[in-house]
Amino acid sequence: MLLSDRDIRAEITAGRVRLDPYDEGLIQPSSVDLRLDRAFRVFQNHRYSHIDPAVEQEDLTELVAPEGDEPFVLHPGEFVLGSTLEVVTLPEDLAGRLEGKSSLGRLGLLTHSTAGFIDPGFSGHVTLELSNVATLPIKLWPGMKIGQLCLFRLSTPAEHPYGSAIYGSRYQGQRGPTPSRAYRDFTRAAVPEIPNGSHGA
């Protein structure tokens, strides 16, 4: 069940959902707007010939932050990691979904590639996967609205919420834009080879 504005306010007032810093004026009819922090992780393309999720590539990205009140300029075709200004904390019976802002999407800014889901029990900054699919550079201003958080109530509280030891929870408590930790539990299923002569239709 998607929570309405009154449900979101009630959950925040009760302390079950925490947004820090919190501005009540950011609540929408069925979501709450989240804002952009000032730090970004930029990919260092010259350091590796390829990206491999199976191994740690410690210096694949570099943390950068514009000085003062300057914007970060995202160029056409560029992909960087950013993060929300807000630290988001969810209880065991609520999951979140981060959606982009329509007004920014119409300018060619994608807020996330695939990772818009937020597990019950999560606490931390939400890492953003920012892409510019427009033909002109886009200025990203610190503190601007960058996305909207929708909240969904589970049928029952999660038996093992995010942060439980059973799941590892690689991003619990993350601060700022956090690079991929896929290598920590990278697994592969056995995939049978295709017999000779069976390639193609």
Curated annotation (Swiss-Prot):
Disulfide bonds: none
Enzyme Commission no: 3.5.4.30
Site feature location: Important for bifunctional activity: 116-117
Active site per database record: 129
Binding site for dCTP: 101-106, 119, 127-129, 148, 162, 174
InterPro entries in the record: dCTP_deaminase, dUTPase-like_sf, dUTPase_trimeric
One Pfam family, short name: DCD
PANTHER family in alphabetical order: DCTP DEAMINASE
Record-stated family: Belongs to the dCTP deaminase family.
Role summary: Bifunctional enzyme that catalyzes both the deamination of dCTP to dUTP and the hydrolysis of dUTP to dUMP without releasing the toxic dUTP intermediate.
Annotated protein name in UniProt: dCTP deaminase, dUMP-forming
Lineage, uppermost ranks: Bacteria, Bacillati, Actinomycetota, Actinomycetes, Frankiales
